[in-house]
Swiss-Prot record:
<feature type="DNA-binding region" description="Homeobox">
    <location>
        <begin position="214"/>
        <end position="273"/>
    </location>
</feature>
<dbReference type="InterPro" id="IPR000327">
    <property type="entry name" value="POU_dom"/>
</dbReference>
<dbReference type="InterPro" id="IPR009057">
    <property type="entry name" value="Homeodomain-like_sf"/>
</dbReference>
<dbReference type="GO" id="GO:0000978">
    <property type="term" value="F:RNA polymerase II cis-regulatory region sequence-specific DNA binding"/>
</dbReference>
<dbReference type="GO" id="GO:0000981">
    <property type="term" value="F:DNA-binding transcription factor activity, RNA polymerase II-specific"/>
</dbReference>
<dbReference type="Pfam" id="PF00046">
    <property type="entry name" value="Homeodomain"/>
</dbReference>
<keyword id="KW-0805">Transcription regulation</keyword>
<dbReference type="Pfam" id="PF00157">
    <property type="entry name" value="Pou"/>
</dbReference>
<dbReference type="InterPro" id="IPR001356">
    <property type="entry name" value="HD"/>
</dbReference>
<dbReference type="GO" id="GO:0061629">
    <property type="term" value="F:RNA polymerase II-specific DNA-binding transcription factor binding"/>
</dbReference>
<dbReference type="GO" id="GO:0006357">
    <property type="term" value="P:regulation of transcription by RNA polymerase II"/>
</dbReference>
<protein>
    <recommendedName>
        <fullName>Pituitary-specific positive transcription factor 1</fullName>
    </recommendedName>
</protein>
<keyword id="KW-0539">Nucleus</keyword>
<keyword id="KW-0238">DNA-binding</keyword>
<dbReference type="InterPro" id="IPR013847">
    <property type="entry name" value="POU"/>
</dbReference>
<feature type="domain" description="POU-specific">
    <location>
        <begin position="124"/>
        <end position="198"/>
    </location>
</feature>
<dbReference type="GO" id="GO:0005654">
    <property type="term" value="C:nucleoplasm"/>
</dbReference>
Amino acid sequence: MSCQPFTSADTFLPLNSEASAALPLIMHPGAAECLPGSNHATNVVSTATGLHYSVPSCHYGNQPSTYGVMAGGLTPCLYKFPEHGLGPGFPAAHQPLLAEGPAVADFKQELRRRSKLAEEPVDTESPEIRELEKFANEFKVRRIKLGYTQTNVGEALAAVHGSEFSQTTICRFENLQLSFKNACKLKAILSKWLEEAEQVGALYNEKVGANERKRKRRTTISIAAKDALERHFGEQNKPSSQEIMRMAEELNLEKEVVRVWFCNRRQREKRVKTSLNQSLFTISKEHLECR
């Protein structure tokens, strides 16, 4: 509260020792607040003649108003502050008056309107939603194909963008459990990560292909085909290239598969014969020793 100038109606008469008992000191109602040395205790103002008048302590000079007190009246506050007394001359304002003013009512109405807008569901048939769903599915497939887990992706993103990324975040994105706004933000980050991961994977595959021979998939031969090959092996254990091609066409197998089968079959027979010869030699030796 600011000090106000005296009006023209306020006058002071000089005081002397004779008139001091009859004339009171005329003061403006707000003048006590402007006196120097005010504090929370009762101050005493001494005149030149020794008169003493009690002046109420000032509570406004060094304390901010906690109820939004402005010049010309009370303005409601939007925030809650600690409760303090307003001091002499100003009764405490009633709380409903401060909380339900026009400004606060408009503010609450605006909050309710924004909350209602935030709760409105996003159109699930919009192109943006469909594009997001498509990317989430493609991301999961490509991530698995590259050999990365959700934990791998979360740790990689957390190292660059912060700890808010984790395995749970990636899982919720792939299952479309994030809000539309957060999913759109994460989509841009995952797109960049996926692009770099595929580049690294391509370089690794090129390096492996140059240094190592790619192993062919193991071929499974049916029982009927094995029986036919066994019959051919009994007739000719070393077939020519033309015979191998003919057998491959009859059995619906690749020529290389038939050729390898005959090679393996000859090696197996050789091992069996070697083992049999060793057994016969051992038996003969033992028989001679017994004599």
